[in-house]
Amino acid sequence: MDNESHSQETESKILEGAKVATRRRRVTRACDMCRRKKIKCDGLRPCKNCKAGKLECTYHMPSSRKSSFSPEYVENLESRVRYLETLLKKNTNFDLSSNSPSFLFFLREQKFQATNELENMSPERKVIFTSMINYGNLFVDAKHGTRYFRGGSSIHVLIQHLIRRLPGDFEICEPYSAYPLGNKNIQFDDNDPEYQFFTPTPRFSIDFMVSSVDPREIQLPGIEEALCITKAAVSYVSGIVFYTTYADFPKKIRLLYSGNYQGNFFPLFLSILCVGYYHHLLNNPSNTELQSLIKKYSFYSERLVKSADNFTIESIQCLLILSIYRYCRTEISAAWYYMKLGLNCCLRLGLHRNITEGFTEEQIDSRRRIFWAIYCYDRQLCTLFGFPLGVRDEDIDQCLPVTPKFPSVTEIEANARLFFFHGVKLYKISSRILTKLYSPNSRNVTKKHISYAVIQDLEQLLDGFYNSLPRVFRAEQPGEFQANHFFYNLQLVYYSFRMLIYRPLLHYLEADSPAMQALKVPDRQTAFTLACKCVDSAIVCVQNLSHLSKGLKRTLDRYYWTTVYCGFSTIVTLIFAALLTKNTNLLIHISVARESIEALAHECVTRRLLPLIDKMRESLMKILESNADGYKQMSPTKAPQVFESESNVPINNGPQQSIDKESNSNTQLPQVETEGQQQSVFDGNIGTIPYQAYNMNEDSFIDINTLSSMLNYHTQAVSIHHPSFYISRSDVPLEEEFQIPNELLAVDPVAESMQENSDIINEAFGLVDPDVSDGKSRESSSLNNSTPFNPTVNIDPASILEHFSQNVMKDSQNS
């Protein structure tokens, strides 16, 4: 050891005295000209390159390259950090040095939490998709020369993408209406008396003095006519969201006609008259006398309602009725205004908190019903506008309304109460959709990207909600139209929210799109399937809308205008999907949706939407015809290659629909309308899909049978009262329609009785948590296992497909 240390010392002394040639220092900087031309700079000023070119050398000068942050911004951050460090030194004993143990521990904890979240995710949940929808854009109102904002959930954003691809001089107009679509080649007669009634009227103004309106000078109808109009209006307004009842109105109306105008009941009474006469106007739209009465009562009601200081429960009811009146006139901007005033009064009265002290049971129930009614309207209008929520779910602890025990409320049928109860639950989930998927500050979602984990969590919430529904809202009740009316409405809103989840990924239907090519090959099938889920949800919306429009036409109950807005949004979604896929099968569903809106169009604003839909459909047909003509002109030697998935198993088409591989060899060419008859793009088996029909390359590795199987499924299905093509749930129609063995759908009688007895419970503001076992999507047992199947557990699609494939093999062997 001593000899080794001695030799090392001698070598070090020799090296110290030696003259070792120094290496040339590597220049880490360069002047701007050398950096721009990507040539070597000698590190002098001027450098040889600039000297030869007789240019000004910028070496050792501030760089002219743009920095991501301005110097002022960096200095501002440094000053803020110094200020925070000063506060910490004065008030705490923390060591703020960069190598202090506490600071290093903090960094390690933060890094560990971030990496732990990623590591605990399954590989498929780590997938990040590109969104085609931003969080919102500014649009120009050409009529008034102003700009306005619409968020990502608004139909404005999707229409903006649509008109870029669809020829025909379409434009975004009417920003304050629910139908923001126009066409330069379609002109309407604005002098029509019926249309002039629907032009925006003056709304509440702070400059208008309330004292300038004398209630005694307002002409009112006779007391008998007023009672009749009020009863009809209250039954119309509170048919679904029963925040007010007719039981207390006759006494208050007689007191009002006796000369007692004190309190806030008078503006509420005027708003009820406005809605009642509007109900009669829809049966006779050209009645100018009714139009003048409606304008007069809405005008006075908007100015007499007290929403600033002396407001009460009746003020909130009045504002909510005025909001519904504007909502029915498609003036969603004015509806938003009055709804926000009512929500502000709700918060100031504490209706969002579960306060029971000092109130009777009837008053407590009334407070709950009023708050949850305005809560649902807030979520609906926030979805239409893409605006932030009016009240956060974290600030609410109000209970849901229980089964009423009061004579004034028990007259409302049980199905309406059930619809209201479960509708509130559904709108709670819509809050999660808007905050997790369309909020700029949500986790796992950036300005242009969406995490697959967020989509899966939202899917679990919606599946858990569906599994908790009673049977009356999961299947049509024969001979009970009113119950089916609520069933169709709830299904329509449910699938519109599912469509809202997948809409940002709709561009993945185009397999050659840059977004699809940017994904890894294993993730492309997932993206394509999610885009197909959006089309699937839109088709189910159309089917529910078709049944709902027929029923509404028979009963003249056509005021749930959300159905019309959902129908318009569905048509835009299907047209955009048809543009991407070039599939004429979607034209059938677009036509059905158009007919449903025509059946609901009882006022001129909605009727004016029909020529625009026809114009869009005409432009779409021209594109599909040109695509089909180009496909037919292909040389026979260059016939399109057919992509066949590894498992040609019929999906949700029943065991009787087996796939014959020999028949798949004959490729059917797409066809369009000929001699008034519309034919499908692919009339052959769903297993034969040409690449060129979807603009696909062979190396895309995407099973495009998914889209064709989905369309075939909706064509072959017996009824629409079933889980849709991509959603696997435990439902009774599954056993009837898909012929699933009983061991897969065995129901625990104890669990079933508990579920039936808990249709309406007094629960706090609790949401279906995906971590709870009832809301989770669990894998079902194998086919050979006879364990009873929990009705709240989702059915595994793989087991169903395996069962179908086994039946297909048995049928082929028997044949």
From Swiss-Prot:
Membrane-crossing residue ranges in chain numbering: 560-580
Record flagged with keyword Ligase: no
GO biological process: DNA-templated transcription; positive regulation of transcription by RNA polymerase II
UniProt keyword list: Cytoplasm, DNA-binding, Membrane, Metal-binding, Nucleus, Transcription, Transcription regulation, Transmembrane, Transmembrane helix, Zinc
Ranges of the DNA-binding region feature: 31-57
SMART domains per record: Fungal_trans, GAL4
InterPro entries hit by this protein: AtrR-like, Transcription_factor_dom_fun, Zn2-C6_fun-type_DNA-bd_sf, Zn2Cys6_DnaBD
Entry GO terms, CC: cytosol; membrane; nuclear membrane; nucleus
Disulfide pattern: none
Keyword Transcription regulation: yes
Superkingdom of origin organism: Eukaryota
Ranges annotated as biased composition (Polar residues): 780-792
Membrane topology: Single-pass membrane protein
Subcellular location: Cytoplasm; Nucleus membrane
Main location: cytoplasm
Region Disordered, residue ranges: 646-668, 769-792
GO molecular function: DNA-binding transcription factor activity, RNA polymerase II-specific; RNA polymerase II cis-regulatory region sequence-specific DNA binding; sequence-specific DNA binding; zinc ion binding
Name used for this protein in its record: Uncharacterized transcriptional regulatory protein C530.08
